[in-house]
Amino acid sequence: WQQKLPTPFFVFKWGPGMSPVLYRDLVLFCQDDDLYPAFYAFEKSTGKPRWKDERLDMAVNYSHPVVCTTNGRDDIVVAGTGMLIGYDPQSGRRRWFARTLLRNIKTTPVCVDGVIYISVQSGGIANQWIASIDQAETGNRDGKLDKAEIQAFVGETPIPEAFFKKTFDRGDLNRDGFLEGAELDVAFLHPDNFAGVPFTVTGENAAEQFVLAVRGGGEGDVTKSHVLWKHPTKHTDHIVSPFVKDGRMFLVKDGGINTVFDTASGKPLRAPRRLGNSGGYFASPVEGDGKIYLAGENGNVLVLKDSPEYEELAKNDLGESIIATPAIADGALFIRTRTKILCIAAGDRAK
């Protein structure tokens, strides 16, 4: 079967990066783009649409849905602009939400024993748009934006008029044809979901980052009742998702900095440690056979002992860059490099 989805539109040039997730008889797919953000569920056997949640209160996000079981009830949890949301998998109804997150979420949460853990890093929306578009080569650096400037940043592909109607026209409060200051927040954030720092915050404080734990389950707004802890830290990453096991939340920051937090309190279990492979990281850590595997953008795969203390077991150079997170299945480690897919296993499995 095949289901056609709306063609996603992104002002920034990262493009789509979301993957489908399987849950029982459903295929789940969340696509938070700049035009028609939505969460879809399809029947696995036929492709027939089961439900759809139009996430019009979301900006662009890249977080994937995860299943969280609390007291025998499954919720499909999605992290997005301003909110962590728990969905009823059968109907697509938003069962609960916690207003805890930032503007643009690229990391994916982890659910362990009914608790959802996430690490996030994001700047305020006004500052992002000014810094990225007005200060770009195509911008005029006057501290404000007009439609022509946004179109020049995007390039030759025409921006859908529906995008400008949804954002620019809403934010241009004085109707002077420009977005400036608070108008940027109004344009690119839903009126019921003002997430992240306001345009008045500049410098280092314009970007927030923290680790967070939220108890799953509940109904309605659970912000006050279900947030277990939330701690600011300089050691999160805006792309790499955490690994959680045995009371430890393991983080890797771009540049090769590793921090481990206590899942009960959110406090660091040890000081930040520079990994044996520095440089860029896009892939998230994975665990198998008592080891943690960290794939670096430079092609080195670092192998650590799965323990509270840092112990490096090996470093393997695969010869070309790695962006994708490795996968573990059937006793094998699968790694996608720039031009290859590798299967690494031991014993009979390797044959």
In which residue ranges do the predicted regions lie?
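Noncatalytic, solvent-exposed loop/strand surfaces
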Residues: W1-K351
